[in-house]
From Swiss-Prot:
Stretches the record annotates as Disordered: 1-60, 628-648
Name by which UniProt lists this protein: Probable ATP-dependent RNA helicase DDX43
Name of the gene: DDX43
SUPFAM superfamilies membership: Eukaryotic type KH-domain (KH-domain type I), P-loop containing nucleoside triphosphate hydrolases
Tissue: Expressed in testis. Expressed in many tumors of various histological types at a level that is 100-fold higher than the level observed in normal tissues except testis.
Bias type Low complexity, positions: 10-25
Keyword Hydrolase: yes
This enzyme's EC code(s): 3.6.4.13
Compositionally biased region (Basic and acidic residues): 26-36, 628-641
Family membership: Belongs to the DEAD box helicase family.
Keywords: ATP-binding, Helicase, Hydrolase, Nucleotide-binding, RNA-binding
Catalysis performed (reactions): ATP + H2O = ADP + phosphate + H(+)
Positions of short motif DEAD box: 396-399
Domain Helicase ATP-binding: from-to ranges: 273-448
Amino acid sequence: MSHHGGAPKASTWVVASRRSSTVSRAPERRPAEELNRTGPEGYSVGRGGRWRGTSRPPEAVAAGHEELPLCFALKSHFVGAVIGRGGSKIKNIQSTTNTTIQIIQEQPESLVKIFGSKAMQTKAKAVIDNFVKKLEENYNSECGIDTAFQPSVGKDGSTDNNVVAGDRPLIDWDQIREEGLKWQKTKWADLPPIKKNFYKESTATSAMSKVEADSWRKENFNITWDDLKDGEKRPIPNPTCTFDDAFQCYPEVMENIKKAGFQKPTPIQSQAWPIVLQGIDLIGVAQTGTGKTLCYLMPGFIHLVLQPSLKGQRNRPGMLVLTPTRELALQVEGECCKYSYKGLRSVCVYGGGNRDEQIEELKKGVDIIIATPGRLNDLQMSNFVNLKNITYLVLDEADKMLDMGFEPQIMKILLDVRPDRQTVMTSATWPHSVHRLAQSYLKEPMIVYVGTLDLVAVSSVKQNIIVTTEEEKWSHMQTFLQSMSSTDKVIVFVSRKAVADHLSSDLILGNISVESLHGDREQRDREKALENFKTGKVRILIATDLASRGLDVHDVTHVYNFDFPRNIEEYVHRIGRTGRAGRTGVSITTLTRNDWRVASELINILERANQSIPEELVSMAERFKAHQQKREMERKMERPQGRPKKFH
């Protein structure tokens, strides 16, 4: 490079990239003297360099530099700083030292070559070394690490440039755990103890023999149970067959039950109440519409009112109910108001509702919070709600909350709930994900479930299956709607919001009064649609799976599955919207070839519920099985048969 007025051209310092034809290799860290012994052949640059061959770079030749270059390694993350903005830094070094500097960039270190007289080479290197040293000092002062850029030295004296030098302090995980436990104890130390056991067994319940109790459970939907406590198992309490057996000591609860007109507890209530009233954590697995809400609400009311710390000062929430959807949250709040006890105040907190109004209600002081995880987590992170005094926690429809991806929000919420609380979990199914959640957040629970553990075949619903085509689905539904009587009430389930809107529009154009319920509608519109359906103003509701849980309308006579749900569990939940509270119901489901993957599972559900199975459905299941076998055979044929032999 020629000099004009002492300033080198910018092209001199442009970073080159040296790569071999196979693999990139970092330059060897050799002393400058050793590298300087390399002749003209030694500084030939590879494919990415600025020059080739055995000659010096043209800029160095033009400048009259006869000495061999001074070569040294530079950490690649310093290259940009050494060059400077627009090359300003390295131009200044070249100008003040009358040298030509070449940087060949590689990882983790780059090769620097300085051309010029020996004195100027040494001066230029000293300038670069001092500049890099200042960069290291600045970094170390900010990070508090004084060995960040120095190579570690092994026992044999070798260096490893990829390992930070110096003795690293070992992390004592046991100490960290101990400190975490101490912090937890300190966090909850000022809270009063919780009273949990409020159960007084009636004479009739205590007189029931084990044989009688087992016989009752078998006759009432085959109730089974398990104690998940480690070690010695606890005996399950006898079921409370009447409301008096459960709440004989709580006349106000009995009065509310009589006002509601209930005759006797549902099976899940009879078995769950003696457990929860004793303060034992509970997992209740049963189909929707079996009275699971009152399983936890009634004992929860008693739990709250009889806490010593709450007498005369209920200004902070003591009970928290988490639900997957706003519809279910509103339904639970409705039940709280219906069975109001001792002036307990509740608030419903959910996404889509007026956030400011919900905050104002919380500020007034409440006893019970019913919430969806997303909105409650939002208010929690904004310090609008204090969960420190929660002593009674409910995870309602836990399987649905996990399906909807709420586990991270649940985890954050429960960090602020005292660990010695009482917890009740309800679920329609018992998959591994719910089992794992129970292990994390419940302590030594008992599990009570109605029917089988995997799925509950709804025996109170007559299930009709129609195997058809996509083109014929609309006409089948029209035929059904035209055959409805004036007292029938139907929920039509569809897979997508757009389908719900499309069907609603077509039916309204045909002078058929309908309402639709899905997530894209405004909250007030959804509430109005649900109210119109409940009161009978409209008798046809078109809904997505959002409404397949928490939709509590007792007089639904039919469920029509226009689209088959994404899995067989949702099918069970959908048809569970009818045949509730001791009534019978009817479901109609249309299937097309697109649904043939679920045909076999659907047959199992129908068989367990003693339903008729159409031949077309059996044929569909057989075709899908044959299709799967064919694909598996094709995959096997495509796989290489063993390893190729090696010949020596």
